[in-house]
């Protein structure tokens, strides 16, 4: 009898990556060393802060803007908005980061934005500095609309940094060797800016879907900063791919990057782009 052909084996389904807003272990790993985080992380362009303040909440700007900072961390952006004359309340899921921010004068309530209870409070602006990817994008946009006053502004922003290839490639290679099982190990040495711009465009889509905002705008601020070897090695452990490494893994990565910077003379110039998606809440409740 002729043999029946067997169906070809099907490849095992690949696990889908966990959305970042559900990756709570990573989201709450930044508080491991809040002092280093606050010391090393770059501030936001003054022009960005000024533009948000000037554009909130629209035709009836009060003397002092009430700003809600979602995922405020150690209060880097919040302090900049306070210096611009705003009253700022932080919401932060990591109690260690919240305590650091409180010690520097920022009132902070510990919760995820989705679970946070506004208790009837409303704001002229809701900002999220380098934090919106840890928030459910649909629930976050809906909640922002609920707590914003009519004509208030939602502003989601963050940095994209592009180290020179002489620094980025040794980092990526060392990371793959040190942490081959990490979900971050497969990322390219340098991700194109367009990748991040596409992410901010998706944020705009989620904002549109609420039907409670005017059409979102995309803002861009380009700038540069020079880093010494010590300054960059201070910042690297505060980034998401490194906050959960074991000490020996982290040491291996930092050693390779330090050697690469030494080969450049101990200093390099980082190109930054700060991207923002922002939208004004409609006047209708």
Could you tell me what each predicted segment is?
Residues 3, 194-285:
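Conserved Class I S-adenosyl-L-methionine
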Residues 116-126:
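A short acidic, Gly/Pro-enriched loop at the edge of an enzyme's catalytic core
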Residues 66-70, 74-116:
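Class I SAM-dependent methyltransferase SAM/SAH-binding core
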Residues 135-144:
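A short, conserved alpha-helix within the catalytic core of class I
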Residues 146-222:
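Conserved catalytic/acceptor-binding region of the Class I
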Residues 130:
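Short catalytic micro-motifs in class I SAM-dependent methyltransferases
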Residues 64-65, 121:
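Nucleotide donor/acceptor-binding cores
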Residues 2-63:
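Conserved class I S-adenosyl-L-methionine
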